[in-house]
Amino acid sequence: MKIIVPATSANLGAGFDSIGIAVNLYLTVEVLEESNDWKIDHDLGNNIPTDEKNLLLTTLSAVLKAKNSSLSAKYHLKMTSEVPLARGLGSSSSVIIAGIELANQLAKLNLTTEEKLELACEIEGHPDNVAPALLGNLVIASTVADKTNYVSSDFPSCKLLAFVPDYELKTVESRKVLPKELAYKEAVAASSIANVLTASLLTKNLKVAGQMIESDHFHENYRASLVPELKILREIGHEFGAYGTYLSGAGPTVMLLLPDDKLNLLTEKINEQNLSGQLYSLEVDSNGLQVKESVL
């Protein structure tokens, strides 16, 4: 059995903790065989556990506990990931979705999509990454009073260009710079911008969406000092025809949305900056969670 989960890019500027898209970088978890102990083979570095301390297996345990279920066996697993760690592309969310599905398959829980999403939001705390990782495409979601509501839609046709800096930025560190509250007038403005962003994405109006993406009041202004590449790449985007540029998740990845015919030009102009990191040309993933050779 093989579980495949896409990376995600959250917030899209003003859609803070609510809007996200799935992109075509993937985490894969393969069940190899039964084993005396849980063991995960991976090449993700020494800081990532290979035993039950791994997020994949702590998630599995949390799901089993929540559903009053258990497993009679332990397994040898293989985990491979194209998703850069701690870069704002939903690496932890992809593992959480994989862990939920691993529990679903091995314990034959027959979870619905809604149940999987509720579990993911309980573990992750907010839906902006886990929802598109599960569902694919564009997802706009809200979790209030332990209930998650969402709208899923195709994303407007465009190219995605992600600059992934060489340094990590943990979400907990990136959240420390955010204010504890916003003034009422600023909150109203921030909300109205997010409303127009949502409407423009759902009506495939990327020109307006790009303007709203870059008008965020919720988080980007506070995080900009942590990711100096954001200002540089946004200016390049303005000069050479991008729809909009935003901080992906908590950063430090910077994502540009652009017309198809601007991809080569913007790639060239960004590479000329000699920034320390990698540039990825990405597409929106429309599948979300996939299971090959399901045991259900």
Curated annotation (Swiss-Prot):
Keywords: Amino-acid biosynthesis, ATP-binding, Cytoplasm, Kinase, Nucleotide-binding, Threonine biosynthesis, Transferase. Its EC number is 2.7.1.39. It is found in: Cytoplasm. It catalyses: L-homoserine + ATP = O-phospho-L-homoserine + ADP + H(+). ATP binds at P84, L85, A86, R87, G88, L89, G90, S91, S92, S93, S94. One of its GO terms (biological process) is threonine biosynthetic process. It is an enzyme of class 2 (transferase). InterPro entries: GHMP_kinase_C_dom, GHMP_kinase_C_sf, GHMP_kinase_N_dom, GHMP_knse_ATP-bd_CS, Homoserine_kinase, Ribosomal_Su5_D2-typ_SF, Ribsml_uS5_D2-typ_fold_subgr. Pathway: Amino-acid biosynthesis; L-threonine biosynthesis; L-threonine from L-aspartate: step 4/5. It comes from the Bacteria. Its main location: cytoplasm. One of its GO terms (molecular function) is homoserine kinase activity. SUPFAM superfamilies: GHMP Kinase, C-terminal domain, Ribosomal protein S5 domain 2-like. GO terms for cellular component: cytoplasm. Pfam families: GHMP_kinases_C, GHMP_kinases_N. NCBIfam families: thrB (TIGR00191). Catalyzes the ATP-dependent phosphorylation of L-homoserine to L-homoserine phosphate. Belongs to the GHMP kinase family. Homoserine kinase subfamily. HAMAP family: Homoser_kinase. This is Homoserine kinase. The gene is thrB.
